[in-house]
A protein has these predicted regions:
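A hydrophobic, multi-pass inner-membrane permease signature
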Residues: 1-242
Length: 242
């Protein structure tokens, strides 16, 4: 039985590596055949054109990585701080209107405002267009699910007696939050941080929407989409000519 389990796990592990191998094989394939025939386990025509193109564009790619790392770091830390502060307030039973506020957060999970209203707010009122903040601010409170997770964790995992004892000793709400609540909430905050970091790292749409005149602020995902479109267009043009 254990041998069968090992065989199944080995098979699944090899299966999980297949997409990575296909990407590596495609990177060494001639662009014309890659566009025409798709992915192959072994390149039909070997070529280093893709890597030569990357080396030629290395300054732009390196800058895009730096922008993405900066946006991911600032956005993740800011998201954790905002979500945890909001969730901590909503977890307090004596907060006036907490049910209404929490209901509005749940409402945003069910109904989206759409791209056009968001664009009008961030462009016309916050003036984030063509700035690096256009890559950070739109995702700060985009996911109400994280607020629900952290709020429930605060209510279920942190005994109110601890904060009450600190209040008796004269501690204020912010002191209690940063000295008691945050250290005890490392597991859920790490989970939320990972989710937010992946969101910021994989985001490419905000670059298209808010950086129409500042391509030097493109993140790596937006830049890769642009490069991929250019490569596919050139490859298709060469294939049609041949």
């Amino acid at each position: 039985m254990q041998l069968l389990a090992h065989i199944v796990m080995i098979f699944l592990s090899v299966l999980a590596l297949v997409p990575f191998w296909l990407l590596i094989a495609a990177s060494f394939s001639d662009s014309n055949y890659a566009v025409a025939e798709g992915y192959r386990f072994i390149p039909k025509v070997f070529s280093l054109d893709a890597y030569q193109y990357i080396l030629q564009q290395w300054n732009q790619i390196g800058r895009a990585y730096l922008v993405t790392l900066t946006v991911t770091a600032v956005g993740t830390v800011s998201s954790i701080l905002i979500v945890s502060l909001l969730s901590y307030g909503l977890s307090q039973k004596d907060l006036p209107g907490r049910r209404v506020i929490f209901g509005l957060i749940l409402f945003t999970m069910l109904f989206s405002g759409g791209i056009v209203p968001q664009y009008m707010i961030y462009n016309n009122y916050l003036h984030l267009k063509n700035t690096i903040w256009g890559l950070i601010v739109p995702n700060l409170l985009l996911n109400g699910f994280t607020v629900v997770l952290v709020r429930n964790y605060f209510q279920q995992s942190i005994p109110p007696e601890l904060s009450e004892a600190m209040e008796i000793d004269g501690a204020g709400p912010f002191y209690i939050f940063f000295r008691l609540v945050m250290p005890l909430s490392t597991p859920i905050l790490a989970t939320v941080g990972l989710m937010e970091a992946v969101t910021y790292w994989n985001d490419w749409n905000n670059g298209y929407v808010y950086l129409s005149k500042r391509r030097d602020l493109y993140g790596i995902q937006t830049l890769l989409n642009v490069l991929n479109q250019n490569i596919q267009a050139l490859a298709q043009q060469d294939f049609d000519m041949n």
